[in-house]
Design a protein with these regions (language model features):
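Hydrophobic alpha-helical segments with strong N-terminal bias
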Residues: 6, 106, 438-439
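Acidic, metal/ion-coordinating pockets
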Residues: 27-327, 376-383, 396, 469, ...
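Bacterial N-terminal signal peptides that target proteins for export
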Residues: 2-12
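Catalytic centers of hydrolytic enzymes
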Residues: 28-39, 44-48, 53-75, 117, ...
Length: 681
């Protein structure tokens, strides 16, 4: 009997072991993997940088340049080749705008053609895709389609105008399915739903998208997720979001619209982010949803490995691959880049007597843009002021001299890096101020404009830096030329500028009379984008910073196109002066110090010139000097509140004091009565 029982137990154990092994194998068979390769904010960076002259795509270890789309191609192709059936390549938007290559986007669509050749499968639209307006974006897409297939373009929260026809060409491409809200990909037996959204912050800095608008990305995501769950029956949900992530003020935690999506729509399994140019070495985990971003400009390629089992999607691991001189360029892709470089020369630069790889200047130091005084900011703003005067200043009429010029940090897109040789090409200089489209000629590049302001309005313009920038960030920091000013961050918002000095024609500075009695007009200059913002800044500051650009007679300018600098007033219409052309012209006129026929960057730009001075003080003189009604009104309100508080305290205290006095008198009376009775006894 014991022998039989022992044999029976052994047989049961063997059967259970086989069952467990079989279940384990089945579980492993059910677990599937998916690799998501991602980039974002490539911004037409097809060459390694910077400087471009030192980019050596086919040799390793001999330059310090980073990026380069042909290097990106090498990495992505190698990763896809390992397991193409389990790999999905996604970009988080802003594949356009930032280099000379985007100037031929409407004819050649180099960026989309290259991304298709590399193997990208899905791309969302960023704010810079709309820099050439909806009609221009339609031209870019049609140009790409005329030359072959393109990746899936995804935009779920775009809203077209029902009354304005200027977005009809783009809407037609949506109706054809060239751009769509989402796409289903099948990889490794998995149904993967990918959709794209534009963040509200990105939409805010896409003024040329009008009349296109954008719906709330979170509400859009909830709607798409329902479709994925109920109709499409997907296994994995990926959101390509051009929303962004930023460090909180504590510099420890994160915030941003990409994080909001993961938190508010937990059904999303992965957020492939963009817009904020944030390099995340590791994903930000929000309720088990990885939020990704790979810096910008092709500096990194991100690789996320997922494991999917029984409906659960989990991150297995993540890797960031740096794109630098340790990666050899893909020869096919580099050949395409070379072809597009020649197209840029033929179509855009030769009319200006330029070439993309032409050495244009040399520098013995780096020029960088900062959220502070910066030598590059000084250079760019000086170039604006100088260039406007080349076309409009007549010494016989002193009021035609440009007194101040301003530029936004958001318009300055790259540093000027000395590198090993110090030689700067046309392409390096273009990358500094590459953005925009003509208001009249519809050609790439923002145009310069000039107008007149009163002294108090100049102060209001500088208050954008002191008061709007702390609330809105990098894009609202201003670089200035022709002026110096001090500000006190402890003063009342919108009235923090203490005083301003402006330079005369000889470069000598003197205080600017900021009183309302000063009726003189001062000529100012900027690009049309910044000018539009200056005109509108009063609207979103409650009227506190209302600025009215005027002509030389003091008449308000209704249409800013009439304020554009005209390169040839004798020709019909307005011949726009592009900022990028003006910038090159300014540099072209620098002295050739060493006699090699190349202009040298002046030593005066080695360091920032300290045009903006922050003075933290609670001294009354620095709190009230040149104060406006904003400060006096706030001070009066505070005084009224203090007096009211004193009155309230006294009002409450009076009956209490009366009660206290009455109690004291009563106590004294009681003591006297007790004392008298004690004596009698």
């Amino acid at each position: 009997m014991l022998r039989f029982l022992r044999g029976f137990l052994i047989r049961v154990g063997i059967i259970l072991a086989f069952v467990l092994i079989d279940k384990s194998s089945l579980a492993q068979d059910n677990a599937k993997t998916l690799t998501i390769i991602h980039t974002n904010d490539l911004q037409s960076r097809l060459l390694g940088f910077a400087p471009n002259r030192e980019y050596t795509p086919f040799t390793l270890g001999d330059d310090q340049t980073i990026g380069g789309i042909a290097r990106v191609a090498t990495v992505i192709k190698a990763l896809k080749q390992k397991s193409p059936e389990t790999t999905l390549v996604i970009d988080g938007g802003d594949f356009l705008m930032g280099t000379l290559f985007h100037t031929i986007a409407r004819e050649e669509s180099a960026e989309l053609r290259l991304l298709h050749e590399i193997g990208y499968e899905a791309i969302t639209l960023g704010n810079h895709e709309f820099d050439f307006r909806p009609r221009g974006l339609a031209q870019i897409l049609n140009a790409a389609l005329s030359k072959g297939d393109i990746p899936a373009l995804l935009a779920a929260n775009i809203v077209f105008s029902e009354s304005d026809t200027s977005d009809d060409a783009l809407q037609a491409l949506f109706k054809r399915g060239v751009v769509k809200p989402y796409q289903i990909f099948v990889k490794n037996g998995l149904r993967i739903g990918v959709f794209g959204v534009m963040g509200m912050n990105a939409a805010e800095v896409a003024p040329f998208a009008a009349p296109v608008t954008f719906a709330n990305p979170v509400e859009t995501a909830k709607r798409i997720v329902k479709i994925f769950k109920n109709d499409e029956r997907v296994d994995v949900i990926v959101c390509a979001s051009h929303g962004g992530v930023w460090r909180k003020s504590d510099q420890k935690n994160w915030e941003g619209e990409d994080i909001d999506l993961a938190r508010e729509v937990p059904e999303i399994d992965v957020v492939v982010g963009g817009h904020s140019h944030t390099f995340l070495k590791e994903p930000i985990m929000v309720n088990n949803t990885p939020v990704l971003q790979a810096g910008a400009e092709g500096r990194y390629v991100g690789v996320l490995n997922l494991e999917i089992e029984n409906g659960d999607v989990a991150m297995k691991d993540y890797q960031s691959i740096a794109i630098n001189d340790s990666v050899a360029a893909d020869r096919h892709i580099q050949a395409m880049v070379d072809h597009y470089q020649e197209m840029v020369n033929q179509k855009k630069l030769r009319p200006h007597g330029l070439a993309l790889d032409q050495v244009f200047a040399e520098t013995q130091f780096d020029l960088t843009i900062k959220e502070d005084n910066s030598n590059l900011g000084d250079l760019v703003s000086d170039a604006i002021r100088w260039s406007i005067d080349q076309y409009e200043y007549n010494p016989a009429f002193p009021n035609t001299r440009t007194v101040i010029a301003v530029e936004s940090n958001g318009m300055i897109r790259d540093d000027l890096v000395m590198g090993k040789s110090g030689l700067l090409q046309v392409s390096d200089l273009f990358r500094v101020v590459p953005l925009g489209i003509g208001m009249v000629d519809d050609q790439p590049g923002f145009a310069l404009m000039s107008f007149y302001l009163t002294a108090p309005e100049i102060k209001k313009a500088f208050e954008v830096l002191t008061s709007v920038h702390p609330l809105k960030g990098w894009d609202y920091f201003l670089q200035i030329s022709g002026a110096k000013f001090r500000y006190n961050p402890n003063r009342v918002i919108f009235d923090r500028v203490i005083d301003i000095e402006i330079a005369d024609a000889g470069g000598n500075f003197a205080p600017l009379d900021l009183s309302s009695s000063n009726k003189q007009l001062y000529k100012a200059g900027c690009n049309i984008f910044v000018g539009t913002f200056i005109k509108l800044v009063g609207d979103f500051t409650g009227g506190f910073l209302r600025i009215v650009p005027k002509d030389s007679s003091g008449k308000p300018i209704e249409n800013l196109n009439t304020a554009l600098v005209d390169a040839n007033p004798n020709a019909a219409g307005i011949q726009e002066v592009k900022q990028w052309v003006a910038f090159l012209d300014y540099v072209r006129n620098f002295e050739d110090v060493n006699g090699n026929n190349i202009p040298d960057m002046p030593a005066g730009y080695r360091f920032p010139q300290g045009r903006i001075v922050r003075v933290d003080s609670w001294r009354a003189a620095l709190l009230y000097k040149n104060a406006t009604a904003v400060t006096w009104g706030a001070s009066g309100l505070i005084l009224v509140l203090l007096l009211g508080l004193v009155w309230l305290v006294r009002l409450v205290a009076r009956p209490l004091m009366k009660n206290a006095v009455a109690s004291k008198m009563k106590a004294r009376t009681s003591i006297k009565t007790w004392a008298s009775s004690s004596v009698l006894r």
